[in-house]
From Swiss-Prot:
Subunit annotation: Homodimer.
Catalytic reaction annotation: Endonucleolytic cleavage to 5'-phosphomonoester
GO molecular function: double-stranded RNA binding; metal ion binding; ribonuclease III activity; rRNA binding
Protein purpose: Digests double-stranded RNA. Involved in the processing of primary rRNA transcript to yield the immediate precursors to the large and small rRNAs (23S and 16S). Processes some mRNAs, and tRNAs when they are encoded in the rRNA operon. Processes pre-crRNA and tracrRNA of type II CRISPR loci if present in the organism.
SUPFAM superfamilies documented for this protein: dsRNA-binding domain-like (SSF54768), RNase III domain-like (SSF69065)
Subcellular location: Cytoplasm
Protein name in the entry: Ribonuclease 3
Species assigned in the record: Rickettsia felis (strain ATCC VR-1525 / URRWXCal2)
C-alpha cells in the first residue's frame, strides 16, 4: 500500500484526481527549488479550504445547536476552525509524513511546524471539495471534527466529560483536579478546586467538591475556546 493510499484510508476518501492531492501536500518551498518543475503548491488550495471549512462548520452548528444564539455559535465556530484545532486534525491524519517539501525546509523543522500542518489540512479540504462535491466534503469534515463538535454538546451539562474528551482529542494528559481551599461551616462549606490539563489551569468554586470540579472544568473549556 503506497503512502497516499494510507492517507486516503484515514480520510475515508479516494481521490479521482491524484494531482489535486499532490498539490494539497506541496509546500511553497518547492517553488524556489530548481529540481521541481511544477510550480504548484498548497497556498491557493489553502485559501479555498479555509472558506469551505468555515461554511461547513457554520452549517453544522446552525443545524445542531438550535438553542444557541449568534454570539455563542460564533464562539464555538472560532474554536472549531482555529489553528490549534485544525492542527490537531492534521496531526491525527499524520499529514507531516506526507507533506512534500525541500530538504532545506525539512532540516529547518518544517515537517513538525504547526503552520505547515494547518495549511496542508485546509488545502486537503479544498482538494476533496474540488475532487468531489460539497456533500462528500461535509461528511468528511463532520467525521474529522466529530469529537470536537461532541465536546461542544457536552460542555453545558457535563463539562468534566467534555474537558476529558478535549484533552484526549488534543493528545494531552487527562485533567487533574486538586482541592485547594475549603471555607465556611461544615453545613455550608465553599470548596475551591484547581483543574489542570498540561499547561492550562483554572479554578472553580462550589458547595461540594463535585460542583467545584464541574465549574472549574466549564471555566477552563470556555477559556480554551
Amino acid at each position: 500500500m503506497v503512502a497516499f493510499e494510507k492517507l486516503e484510508k484515514l480520510l475515508g476518501y479516494s481521490f479521482k484526481n491524484k494531482e489535486l492531492l499532490i498539490e494539497a501536500l506541496s509546500h511553497p518551498s518547492l517553488r524556489q527549488h530548481h529540481e521541481y518543475k511544477d510550480d504548484k503548491d498548497y497556498e491557493r488550495l489553502e485559501f479555498l479550504g479555509d472558506a469551505v471549512l468555515n461554511l461547513v462548520v457554520t452549517e453544522i452548528l446552525f443545524k445542531n445547536f438550535a438553542n444557541y444564539n449568534e454570539g455563542n455559535l460564533a464562539k464555538i465556530r472560532s474554536y472549531l476552525v482555529c489553528k490549534e484545532t485544525i492542527c490537531v486534525v492534521g496531526t491525527k491524519l499524520t499529514l507531516k509524513d506526507y507533506i512534500i517539501m525541500t530538504h532545506g525546509e525539512e532540516v529547518a523543522g518544517g515537517r513538525d511546524n504547526p503552520n505547515n500542518i494547518e495549511n496542508a489540512t485546509e488545502a486537503l479540504i479544498a482538494a476533496i471539495y474540488l475532487d468531489s462535491n460539497i456533500e462528500t466534503t461535509r461528511n468528511i469534515i463532520g467525521k474529522l471534527w466529530a469529537e470536537f463538535i461532541k465536546i461542544q454538546n457536552l460542555t453545558d451539562y457535563d463539562p468534566k466529560t467534555a474537558l476529558q474528551e478535549w484533552a484526549q482529542a488534543s493528545s494531552h494528559h487527562l485533567p487533574i483536579y486538586r482541592l485547594i481551599k475549603r471555607e465556611g461551616a461544615a453545613h455550608s462549606s465553599t470548596f475551591t478546586v484547581l483543574v489542570k490539563v498540561k499547561d492550562y489551569k483554572q479554578i472553580g468554586t462550589g458547595h461540594s467538591i463535585k460542583e467545584a470540579e464541574k465549574n472549574a472544568a466549564r471555566k477552563l473549556l470556555h477559556k480554551l475556546k
